[in-house]
Amino acid sequence: MRRVSNLAFNQEFPAVSGLSGIPKDNRVKLARDLRNAFDADAVGIWLEGFPLVPLGWLYRKDSNREAVLRKLDEGGTLTGHVEVQNRARKAIKVVVFWL
């Protein structure tokens, strides 16, 4: 089933990656962020080719988060892409994936 979640963007990502923006044709991997000191159940979003730091995370109250954590805990892998959607005339970064 296709899922869309808002992306909590990692403000440190541009400096670490050297990218000034997210490539249009991107691929991301969803995985537990075991190095997140603030959230033991953080779901990180890693941009393909940049494994050192996550591009961002799913929000704690995201409606897809529990299902994503279950899938990851069962040994599943989740991939998708990031896109910008316009909502109420605001550009919002979202991660689109299949669950």
Q: Where are each of the predicted segments found?
A:
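Conserved active-site motif detector
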Residues: M1-L99
